[in-house]
Amino acid sequence: MTEKVSSSLRESPTARWVVLILVSFTMMCMYYLTDAMAPLQQQLQSNLHWSATDYGFFTSGYGWFNVFLLMLVFSGIILDKIGTRFTGILAIFIMLVGAGIKYWAISGHFSGLFGLNIFSWHILSETPLSAIMAGFGFGVFGVGCEMFGIAANKAVVRWFRGKEMALAIGLNTSTGRIGTALAMFTPLPLYNLTKNVSAPILLSVLLLCIGLLVFIFFAVLDKRLDKEEADAGISKEEEFKVSDIRDIAQNRAFWYIAILCVLFYSAVFPFIKFATNLIVQKYTVPDLFAGYIPALLPFSALLLTPLFGGISDKKGKAASIMILGSILLVCVHLLFSIPSLNSFPIAIGLVILLGIAFSLVPSAMWPSVAKIIPHSKLGTAYAMIFWVQNIGLMLVPLLIGYVLDKYCIIGTITKIVDGKEQHLTQYNYTIPMLIFACFGFVAIIFAYLLKAEDKKKGYGLEKPNVVE
């Protein structure tokens, strides 16, 4: 029996890394679709007559169903009950449906429905129906996106447990960041080429279809691993029970990680959504090139997340790494908030530093969850963390959009956009940056609490991941 186990796919470095490539490629396609509209904030506002609040409302749609309908929690239960393969494929189909709704809402097809100009409709006070429908589609997409995220994490943990787990999770995360980086600088040239603000969504759907085919290949390998483990007499994991949710919720370290997660990501992902407009307005970078600077964030994360993950695998210190990343996050946003620091080389440097922070925390945080929660409950645990995270990702863009419109308008400028004269609102981003810095400061506190809890309970967060 020992012979069979030692020759299993999971013990083969080649098989493990092939699995990682397959899962990570689909993650990359998913992240591209998530952020494809971020560089087009100005075009959405001018073409669809949205305000910054409307744009924030649209981006907040990502978390509507995950938060209010608890779809993320159900996703985790589905994952632990039915498995990674089914959950991953289901998630991709849900993402495709959501992307289709989002495309319909933003494209001209929506405005011409039944011969009516629906872009002129307003419900929920002053929010255009186009923004509401786009947010609805983004919400459906968000259900699939978060479902796939937890499935991917559990898949990587399964194949790399006791091996290079932090490095693998870091590589998976950083490959996803390639999608974010591509979403920062390709949509605007694509818009200029097609004069269609929804064109990047079509490209995203095509990439996601390719990602589906790639993930099916992963499913074949994962099924083979199941068979090998069954033949080797390796017992299956415990079945999911509803009481597992209670057990997870009673774990104090779990909540420290969950709160740290929502605070940290609330200071990064909403920043990315508004970053291109910030770069244009504060640092006077031309629209065409403004997306290139925020793209440095995921690119630096791409290079550094595996590095820090490898350090965590060999040296440990995961809780300390999370503290360091949170401190760096605060410093970056405080520097972004200073009005006099307005030259574009400073913006480049700060985005790179933010990318380092963005590498430090996730490379240590996600492997740490696998140390405090049993593998049979891991899907539900990841889902609960992602649910808490989605509360922040839903509310913070709304908050930032509201603050910009309420307190940060400094005037308007007239520009020629697509041959038409447009009056564009100018914003001072100091207050939003201070809000992000506050999130980072509270994240530092919870990172210290997590380190203290680890010292008390002995989870081994400060110990290496690789079992010699």
Regions found by a protein language model. Give the residues of each.
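Juxtamembrane intracellular "pre-TM" segments in multi-pass secondary transporters
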Residues: T2-P13, L225-I257, V466-E468
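Extracytoplasmic gate region of multi-pass secondary transporters
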Residues: M37-Q41, N251-T305, P362, W366, ...
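Central cavity-lining transmembrane alpha-helices of secondary-active solute carriers
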Residues: S60-I77, A295-F308
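C-terminal ends and interior cores of transmembrane alpha-helices
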Residues: F93-E126, I327-L341
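Cytoplasmic helix-loop-helix junction between adjacent transmembrane helices
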Residues: A131, G137-T175
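Symmetry-related core transmembrane helices of the 12-TM Major Facilitator Superfamily/SLC fold
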Residues: A199-F218, T430-Y448
